[in-house]
């Protein structure tokens, strides 16, 4: 069992200050140090890498694809049609929204996907007055940095105090200002989708 004094001392030693503003990498570093100092194992979910073994079905499918030469060619620029279709079906099943498979763009991860999205938004909305991305919080902290690097304005909305109708009203209020070009919600449970 971890004791509060050890955790508090490490937070102070790492100069994290207000721990509620720590980044994902800060959390990862802290958990590694605490593991080493206490001998207590942690389940690492902070980087989206829980260390779970892939399913046998996935391993067999990957082996089959490699044996058939999939690594010898690049996939189509817009993505593999059956994967785009599956992504569309997933969104429909999970949150009940119809998304055209054409709008499902596969990436190697959420960092790459959001960076490409922010680049596209920056170019598509330049000079229109819609120059700000609304980032729903809690989200993926690196996205604010990505916007800064690109020069795309961003504003956050911490949904802790907004649920149901209150959230809808707040979103409508923010969008009504006329400067929002996109709303980004990276679910902390799995930012990659």
List each model region and its residues.
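Short glycine/proline- and acidic residue-enriched helix-loop micro-motifs
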Residues: 10-14, 187-190
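N-terminal small-domain helix-loop-helix segment of the aminotransferase-like
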Residues: 2-7, 14-112
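Conserved core of the PLP fold type I
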Residues: 67-193
């Amino acid at each position: 069992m971890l004791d509060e004094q050890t955790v508090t001392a490490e937070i102070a030693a790492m100069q994290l200050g207000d721990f509620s503003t720590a980044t994902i990498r800060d959390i990862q570093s802290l958990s590694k140090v605490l593991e080493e100092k206490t001998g207590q194992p942690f389940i690492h979910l902070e980087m989206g890498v829980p260390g779970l073994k892939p399913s046998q079905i996935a391993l067999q499918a990957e082996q089959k694809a490699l044996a058939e030469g999939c690594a010898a060619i690049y996939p189509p620029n817009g993505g593999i049609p059956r994967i785009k279709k599956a992504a569309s079906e997933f969104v429909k099943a999970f949150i009940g929204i119809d998304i055209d498979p054409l709008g499902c763009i596969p990436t190697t991860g959420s960092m790459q996907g959001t960076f490409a999205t922010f680049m596209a938004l920056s170019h598509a909305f330049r000079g229109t007055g819609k120059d700000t991305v609304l980032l729903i919080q809690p989200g993926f902290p690196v996205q604010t940095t990505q916007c800064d690097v690109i020069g795309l304005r961003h504003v956050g909305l911490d949904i802790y105090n907004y649920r149901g109708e209150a959230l809808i009203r707040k979103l409508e209020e923010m969008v009504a200002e006329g400067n929002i070009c996109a709303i980004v919600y990276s679910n902390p449970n799995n930012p990659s989708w």
